[in-house]
Amino acid sequence: MNRDIVLGILLTLFSIITYNSCPYTNYEVYAHNFSVTDDAALLTLIEQIKAETELVNTYFVASNSSNSSVIEHAKNAVNFTNSLNDKLRQSTVADITQVYTNGLYNSTTLALVVANLVDEILRNYGSAYGITYDLTNMSNMVMATMLHGNDNSSSGHSIMLEKNNAVPVNMYNYQTAQVLSNVVNRLFNDKLSGQAPVNEKVKIDNLEQSIKDLKYAINNKVRAEGLMEIVHMKIHPMLQSAYDLKLVVR
């Protein structure tokens, strides 16, 4: 069965479930304190749908993979599609394709999408390792550091470089974290970096490296606090500064 057939099956499944979906679906609330626009929220859902569909295709064609990965990522794609349709029903958007295209060339919108997806990477990575605290909450960095404080003091190097010796308890979440890191790299390199102000070149170069570091950390199963360090101390602050992202006023 080729890719087009797989996508056809998924789209059919989407249409059936979306038609019967409950209008009271709860939306994900992004834990970071950026003020998220409606367009950024829509684009984030679209990128999540695309990422989960990519995983369905990847594990469907892999001869040594189990059907469980295909099923789980298909379920995720359906859930995100339902959330997208629920959100569209509550908005005045007439053409989602136009919103998506425009968003890719709006630096503020796209920077918010990247920030959202980075939060989703943390959530999935935390779930993959059965971590009970919220990785997207910056204050939990203190808790994470204390949990491994003795190890870090004896090793003499940054927690960011330390490999996680634990085995993932949810491989599907780990797979999602991996593919989302690819999405973030692609969006930043192909679209967002070129939209930055000229005087922010040094910051953009550092941001590019930090996004690469995040991908490396995920692929090499670095401890969760290492990912938190990259995101909360580097990626999010640089996104905010370079693209003038606004914080939520509480």
How would you describe each model-predicted region?
Residues M1-G8:
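Bacterial N-terminal signal peptides that target proteins for export
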Residues I9-P23:
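Bacterial N-terminal signal peptides
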Residues C22, Y27-R250:
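Mature extracytoplasmic or organellar-lumen-exposed domains after removal of signal/transit peptides
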